[in-house]
Amino acid sequence: MLAEFARHGATWMHMVDLDGAKAGRVAQIEIIADLVKKSGLNIEVGGGIRTTEDVDKLFRAGVKRIVVGSLCVSNPDLVNDWFRRFGADSIVLDADNIPRIRTHGWQEESKLSIYDVLDNYPLAKHVLCTDIAVDGTLEGASLALYAQMLKKLPQLEIIASGGVGSIEDIYKLNELGVHGVVVGKAIYEGKIDLAELLNFNNKT
């Protein structure tokens, strides 16, 4: 599938180490390194990143950006240290919403909102927000959520995720001003044509 993405002109791939997210450690480093090498894509990876050793392993494997979720809630001091060491372009904060931030592979709900968490990160540049309430439904993205985030957080590049079921959803998110959109199930189930998606991407 990655070869197909690359053949159509894709440049970025978002990956989640689901085993790592549940285990609380990066669990699939060999597979990730192999995919980076064979695909030729810029790959960002999340799931189970808890230590500086995890981060070092991923960057040594060729990963371009890491996606930090649970730890950005539980240990802002460490994550802010990563911003200083690796730079804002290398880190995406993952703030998943329903309506409070969920952590540990969405198994635990914190007492914090997206805005509570992001207040701790003055160096942040990229924020991924999945609305868990619509994730996997293919019924449309949460436009009101992202509109509110863009208004409150104009300094950040917002990446939307969850609910995207058609190319029209992506047009709507683009019109709002989000920086990027994670699309997965809609491609695999044929709701969005890969060539059409990448043609849109090349125009924007």
Question: Language-model features: where?
Answer:
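Short, acidic/polar
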Residues: 1-6, 51-56, 108-120
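Catalytic cores of alpha/beta
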Residues: 31, 36-39, 43-66, 144-183
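C-terminal helical cap(s) of enzyme catalytic domains, especially alpha/beta-barrels
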Residues: 77-86, 91, 171-176, 180-204
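Conserved beta-strand positions in the central sheet of alpha/beta enzyme cores
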Residues: 14-17, 44, 67-68, 92, ...
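Active-site/ligand-binding-proximal alpha/beta "capping" segment
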Residues: 31-34, 111-159
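Glycine-rich, proline-tolerant flexible connector loops at the mouths of alpha/beta enzymes
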Residues: 12-30, 130-138
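Conserved anion-binding
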Residues: 63-135
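Conserved, mostly hydrophobic/aromatic
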Residues: 5, 13, 58, 93, ...
